From Swiss-Prot:
GO cellular component: plasma membrane
Transmembrane feature ranges: 1-21, 32-52, 89-109, 182-202, 261-281, 285-305, 344-364, 384-404
Protein name, per record: Uncharacterized transporter YutK
Gene name per UniProt: yutK
UniProt KW keywords: Cell membrane, Membrane, Transmembrane, Transmembrane helix, Transport
GO BP terms, alphabetized: nucleoside transmembrane transport
Length: 404
């Protein structure tokens, strides 16, 4: 039943993308079918097949060790301030982890390890799905770094991207999350193995929906075998790389903290207004979260959430789209134990992406800053990219639900 439900959800999600496709006759069936099969195969290996699941759980435990190492530095700095009552203080336990992992990724970048990983995964995706090297490389980079950093690896080529490539790169960025913030989600109570699996599944999903909604109609500039990745200015040495990474991580952590503070407070204001307004008509308990739940509950049901849990699941999906994934994860993490394992898995996958309305401004600032001549294209494609990124996350969630 789970497999049939998941397949029906996957077909429905792909059908939605097909409806929004600009050039249906130009859709490459190979990209869609192979991309979908890649996601299903990966989901089966890490969630259902005992040997594959054991290996992935081992890998997840190694990643969890990195979080423990990060906590050593956090404890040294904050000591007894780390806890407020019985719960760790968010600003002192979650945000500093982002700083540590940003520094770690910067060191791996300096040692050329990340570039090698990008090339291997990107090359594999390009051969499997028949996508260009540029967009495949960007999709691979998005597994580990965020939508702001991944375009840097293809910086010299952005201005000359085809419209389809530009859209696909935008979609890939929105369907994934940054490696540094991923570990922040884990500290909110989201199982690390689900977050890692969702990040890897986002790569083929982003390519599939990018090519479904805006198929390629032009000749790409990166069909040549001598395509080279941009590696940036780099750091003087490992210490310099770690320092620069920590500084970048601090900026991200401060932005996340400020954003959460503002959004949580604004939600409280909105809920106060809604409660007062609807209270005049005798309606109690009307909140932004409950409204989003009613709007998005059919989508939650479509991807495999049982109907009795769909209202709350839909609320988190709506929060992720309208606000952002960190707000949704922080609320979901507080109640994850109240859901069935299947629903908790589906929600964990569905929220794992940057596809929200505020990300359009981020894309304009990053991609538009790297290629000012494409800013108008990015602005026009923004809403469609959010749709494509959201559908990519929902597809991963539907597939994950098949194997729980």
């Amino acid at each position: 039943m789970n497999v049939l439900w998941g397949l029906l959800g996957a077909v429905a999600i792909i059908a939605i993308a097909f409806l929004f496709s600009e050039k249906k006759s130009n859709i490459k069936i190979r990209t869609v079918i192979v991309g979908l099969c890649t996601q299903v195969a990966f989901g089966y290996i890490v969630l259902k097949w005992e040997a594959g699941r054991a290996v992935f759980l081992w890998f997840s435990s190694r990643v969890q060790l990195l979080i423990d190492y990060a906590n050593e530095g956090i404890s040294f700095i904050f000591g007894p301030l780390l806890k407020v009552g019985d719960s760790p203080a968010f600003a002192l336990s979650v945000l500093p982890v982002i700083i540590f992992f940003s520094a770690l990724i910067a060191v791996l970048y300096h040692l050329k390890i990340m570039q090698l990983v990008f090339r291997v995964i990107g090359g594999g995706l390009s051969k499997l799905l028949g996508t260009s090297k540029t967009e495949s490389l960007a999709a691979a980079a998005n597994i580990f770094v965020g939508q702001s950093e991944s375009p840097l690896v293809i910086k010299p080529l952005i201005a000359g991207l085809t419209r389809s490539e530009l859209f696909t790169i935008m979609t890939s960025g929105l369907s994934a999350v940054a490696g540094s913030t991923l570990f922040g989600y884990a500290l909110l109570g989201i199982p690390i193995e689900y977050l890692l699996a969702a990040s890897f599944m986002a790569a083929p999903a982003g390519l599939v929906f990018g090519k479904l909604i805006i198929p390629e109609t032009e000749k790409t500039q990166t069909v040549k075998s001598d395509f080279k990745m941009d590696e940036g200015e780099g750091a003087a040495n490992v210490i310099d790389a770690a320092a620069k990474g920590a500084s970048t991580g601090l900026q991200i952590a401060l932005n996340v903290g400020a954003m959460l503070l503002a959004f949580v407070a604004l939600i409280a204001v909105v809920n106060g207004i809604l409660g007062g307004a609807f209270g005049l008509f005798g309606l109690k308990g009307v909140t932004l979260e409950s409204i989003l739940g009613y709007v998005f509950s059919p989508i939650a049901f479509l991807i495999g959430v049982p109907w009795h849990e769909a209202l709350q699941a839909g609320s988190y999906i709506g929060q992720k789209l309208v606000l952002n994934e960190f707000v949704a994860y922080s609320n979901f993490g507080s109640h994850i134990g109240e859901f069935s394992k299947k629903t908790a898995t589906i929600i964990s996958f569905a929220l794992c992406g940057f596809a929200n309305f505020s990300s359009i401004a981020i894309m304009l600032g990053t991609l538009g800053g790297l290629a000012p001549s494409r800013r108008s294209d990015i602005a026009r494609l923004g809403l469609k990219a959010v749709l494509a990124g959201t559908l990519a996350n929902l597809l991963s969630a539907a597939i994950a639900g098949m194997f729980i």
